[in-house]
Protein backbone atom coordinates (compact mmCIF):
# COMPACT_ATOMS: atom_id res chain seq x y z
CA UNK A 1 0.00 0.00 0.00
CA UNK A 2 1.23 3.50 -0.85
CA UNK A 3 0.34 6.65 1.09
CA UNK A 4 -0.34 10.04 -0.43
CA UNK A 5 3.27 11.11 0.25
CA UNK A 6 4.61 8.02 -1.52
CA UNK A 7 2.25 8.63 -4.45
CA UNK A 8 3.64 12.18 -4.77
CA UNK A 9 7.14 10.70 -5.09
CA UNK A 10 6.03 8.88 -8.26
CA UNK A 11 3.51 11.13 -10.05
CA UNK A 12 3.83 14.94 -10.28
CA UNK A 13 0.20 15.87 -9.56
CA UNK A 14 -0.54 18.11 -6.57
CA UNK A 15 -3.58 19.69 -4.93
CA UNK A 16 -6.09 20.45 -6.25
CA UNK A 17 -5.39 18.05 -9.12
CA UNK A 18 -4.03 15.02 -7.27
CA UNK A 19 -7.08 12.76 -7.40
CA UNK A 20 -5.72 9.59 -5.77
CA UNK A 21 -5.59 9.21 -1.98
CA UNK A 22 -3.97 5.78 -1.74
CA UNK A 23 -2.59 3.03 -3.95
CA UNK A 24 -3.75 -0.33 -2.61
CA UNK A 25 -2.01 -2.63 -5.09
CA UNK A 26 0.56 -2.26 -7.83
CA UNK A 27 2.20 -4.65 -10.24
CA UNK A 28 4.72 -2.43 -11.98
CA UNK A 29 4.01 -2.22 -15.68
CA UNK A 30 0.90 -4.41 -15.35
CA UNK A 31 -1.81 -2.97 -13.11
CA UNK A 32 -2.63 -0.76 -10.16
CA UNK A 33 -5.55 -0.22 -7.82
CA UNK A 34 -6.12 3.04 -5.97
CA UNK A 35 -8.80 4.87 -4.05
CA UNK A 36 -10.20 8.39 -4.05
CA UNK A 37 -12.29 9.43 -1.07
CA UNK A 38 -14.81 11.93 -2.40
CA UNK A 39 -15.68 14.57 0.20
CA UNK A 40 -18.05 17.53 0.25
CA UNK A 41 -14.96 19.76 0.54
CA UNK A 42 -13.74 19.02 -3.00
CA UNK A 43 -13.04 22.29 -4.81
CA UNK A 44 -14.90 21.19 -7.94
CA UNK A 45 -18.20 20.92 -6.05
CA UNK A 46 -18.29 24.73 -5.79
CA UNK A 47 -19.36 24.79 -9.42
CA UNK A 48 -20.49 21.23 -10.23
CA UNK A 49 -23.17 21.64 -8.97
CA UNK A 50 -23.64 23.87 -5.90
CA UNK A 51 -27.10 22.48 -5.12
CA UNK A 52 -26.50 18.93 -6.36
CA UNK A 53 -22.89 17.81 -5.96
CA UNK A 54 -21.74 15.33 -8.61
CA UNK A 55 -18.07 14.57 -9.33
CA UNK A 56 -17.37 15.56 -12.95
CA UNK A 57 -16.89 12.50 -15.15
CA UNK A 58 -13.70 13.91 -16.63
CA UNK A 59 -12.19 13.98 -13.13
CA UNK A 60 -13.11 10.33 -12.58
CA UNK A 61 -11.25 9.56 -15.82
CA UNK A 62 -8.30 11.71 -14.68
CA UNK A 63 -8.18 9.80 -11.37
CA UNK A 64 -8.05 6.55 -13.34
CA UNK A 65 -5.27 7.97 -15.53
CA UNK A 66 -3.27 8.91 -12.42
CA UNK A 67 -3.52 5.34 -11.10
CA UNK A 68 -2.39 4.03 -14.50
CA UNK A 69 0.49 6.52 -14.51
CA UNK A 70 1.56 5.22 -11.10
CA UNK A 71 1.80 1.65 -12.45
CA UNK A 72 3.90 2.80 -15.41
CA UNK A 73 6.13 5.26 -13.55
CA UNK A 74 6.99 2.72 -10.84
CA UNK A 75 8.82 0.71 -13.52
CA UNK A 76 12.58 1.17 -13.10
CA UNK A 77 13.09 2.43 -16.66
CA UNK A 78 10.36 5.09 -16.22
CA UNK A 79 11.29 6.48 -12.82
CA UNK A 80 11.67 10.26 -12.94
CA UNK A 81 9.68 10.52 -16.17
CA UNK A 82 6.20 11.89 -16.84
CA UNK A 83 3.14 10.04 -18.12
CA UNK A 84 0.87 12.16 -20.29
CA UNK A 85 -2.80 11.36 -20.89
CA UNK A 86 -2.87 10.92 -24.69
CA UNK A 87 -6.30 9.51 -25.49
CA UNK A 88 -9.49 7.84 -24.43
CA UNK A 89 -11.83 5.37 -26.11
CA UNK A 90 -15.08 3.67 -25.19
CA UNK A 91 -15.66 5.77 -22.08
CA UNK A 92 -18.95 5.12 -20.31
CA UNK A 93 -20.37 6.67 -17.14
CA UNK A 94 -22.78 4.36 -15.37
CA UNK A 95 -23.28 5.90 -11.94
CA UNK A 96 -23.01 9.34 -10.37
CA UNK A 97 -20.24 9.86 -7.83
CA UNK A 98 -21.21 12.08 -4.90
CA UNK A 99 -19.74 13.26 -1.58
CA UNK A 100 -19.19 10.34 0.79
CA UNK A 101 -18.39 7.87 -1.99
CA UNK A 102 -15.10 6.01 -2.11
CA UNK A 103 -13.96 5.45 -5.69
CA UNK A 104 -12.00 2.26 -6.30
CA UNK A 105 -9.81 2.91 -9.34
CA UNK A 106 -8.43 -0.09 -11.23
CA UNK A 107 -6.22 0.10 -14.31
CA UNK A 108 -4.85 -2.91 -16.17
CA UNK A 109 -2.16 -2.06 -18.69
CA UNK A 110 -2.91 -3.86 -21.94
CA UNK A 111 -0.11 -2.59 -24.17
CA UNK A 112 3.33 -1.06 -23.62
CA UNK A 113 5.37 -0.33 -26.72
CA UNK A 114 8.15 2.21 -26.49
CA UNK A 115 6.84 5.45 -25.00
CA UNK A 116 3.17 4.63 -25.72
CA UNK A 117 0.83 2.49 -23.64
CA UNK A 118 -2.81 1.59 -23.23
CA UNK A 119 -4.86 0.52 -20.26
CA UNK A 120 -8.32 -0.78 -19.42
CA UNK A 121 -9.76 1.30 -16.58
CA UNK A 122 -12.70 0.81 -14.22
CA UNK A 123 -13.95 3.01 -11.39
CA UNK A 124 -16.40 1.51 -8.90
CA UNK A 125 -18.26 2.61 -5.77
CA UNK A 126 -19.26 -0.17 -3.37
CA UNK A 127 -18.80 -2.71 -6.18
CA UNK A 128 -21.04 -0.78 -8.58
CA UNK A 129 -19.39 0.41 -11.81
CA UNK A 130 -19.24 4.20 -12.09
CA UNK A 131 -17.01 4.48 -15.18
CA UNK A 132 -15.15 2.33 -17.69
CA UNK A 133 -12.67 3.51 -20.32
CA UNK A 134 -9.69 2.55 -22.43
CA UNK A 135 -6.85 5.01 -21.79
CA UNK A 136 -3.81 5.85 -23.93
CA UNK A 137 -0.72 7.49 -22.45
CA UNK A 138 2.70 8.66 -23.53
CA UNK A 139 5.88 8.56 -21.44
CA UNK A 140 8.37 11.42 -21.69
Swiss-Prot record:
Active site: 48
Protein EC: 4.2.1.59
A GO-annotated cellular component: cytoplasm
Record field: catalytic activity: a (3R)-hydroxyacyl-[ACP] = a (2E)-enoyl-[ACP] + H2O
Domain of life: Bacteria
Molecular function, one GO term: (3R)-hydroxyacyl-[acyl-carrier-protein] dehydratase activity
Record-linked Pfam families: FabA
CDD domains named in the record: FabZ
Entry keyword Secreted: no
Keywords, in A-Z order: Cytoplasm, Lipid A biosynthesis, Lipid biosynthesis, Lipid metabolism, Lyase
Example GO BP: fatty acid biosynthetic process
Gene3D superfamilies, per the entry: Hotdog Thioesterase (3.10.129.10)
Broad EC category: lyase
Subcellular location: Cytoplasm
Cystine pairings recorded for this chain: none
Family (UniProt): Belongs to the thioester dehydratase family. FabZ subfamily.
Function: Involved in unsaturated fatty acids biosynthesis. Catalyzes the dehydration of short chain beta-hydroxyacyl-ACPs and long chain saturated and unsaturated beta-hydroxyacyl-ACPs.
Matching HAMAP family: FabZ
Protein name: 3-hydroxyacyl-[acyl-carrier-protein] dehydratase FabZ
Native species: Exiguobacterium sibiricum (strain DSM 17290 / CCUG 55495 / CIP 109462 / JCM 13490 / 255-15)
Upper classification of the organism: Bacteria, Bacillati, Bacillota, Bacilli, Bacillales
Gene name linked to the record: fabZ
Amino acid sequence: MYTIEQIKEVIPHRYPFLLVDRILEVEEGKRAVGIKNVTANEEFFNGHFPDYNVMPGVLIVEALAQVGAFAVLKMEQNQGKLAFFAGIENCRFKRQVVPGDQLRLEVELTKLRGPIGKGRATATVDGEVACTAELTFAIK
